[in-house]
Amino acid sequence: MPLDWNALLGQMNAMQRLTHFAARWGFIKEEQLRVQLLSVRRKAYEAELGTQAGNVGCAGRAGRLTNDSITGLLNEASNRDAQSISNTFNYFLAVEILRAGETNPRGGPLYYARTISAWAPTYWQWKYPQITQVAELTARAMAQQDFYRINGAALGSAKLEPQSAVCPVCLGWIARGAVPLRVALSNPGNFHPNCPHIWQITAKHVAKEDCPLLWMGS
């Protein structure tokens, strides 16, 4: 269930609500983040296509995403993420404002401005790398599925990497070791929020003369 920052506004005084209004994310920030995430996803998707081309013996083939349907899916994922990230920030912004009010009930505009100016960079310092990692790994997992589905070359095996985990699902996959490639592609990464895992694939090579025919994002 999404965090409800609007519910916290009812606990604020006028000064705190004004502070939240001034600092919270809205459509413009969300749209900027959507564009950034789409760029991250697109680059990761294209790079993964190149990696998988190398895995089937066609090193040097570069991914170039021109498929509108796939680009649309990457954009939808980026838009969902941007809205979720915005909502989460606005919630914890409200929590921080209420905490600041408990610390200094008589705090004025300058007090709240300084408090949020100190808090926000710390929040984003750990959040942004996490956001980028999720965008990259989900795009790579999608590229793996599309590459082998469209090229019809899903023969081989895969292991989940990195080989350390705390999530029971990830631990289970790691314990299984190498699994058939088709099984891996049917169970793409991102098994839980902020999952760092992705399949490392060993695939059967295609004939050299077929390398120019590989689908690489068109």
Give residue spans per PLM region.
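Acidic, glycine-rich two-metal-ion catalytic cores of nucleic acid-processing enzymes
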Residues: 119-211, 215
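N-terminal leader/targeting and assembly helices and adjacent pre-domain segments
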Residues: 1-139, 151-152, 203-218
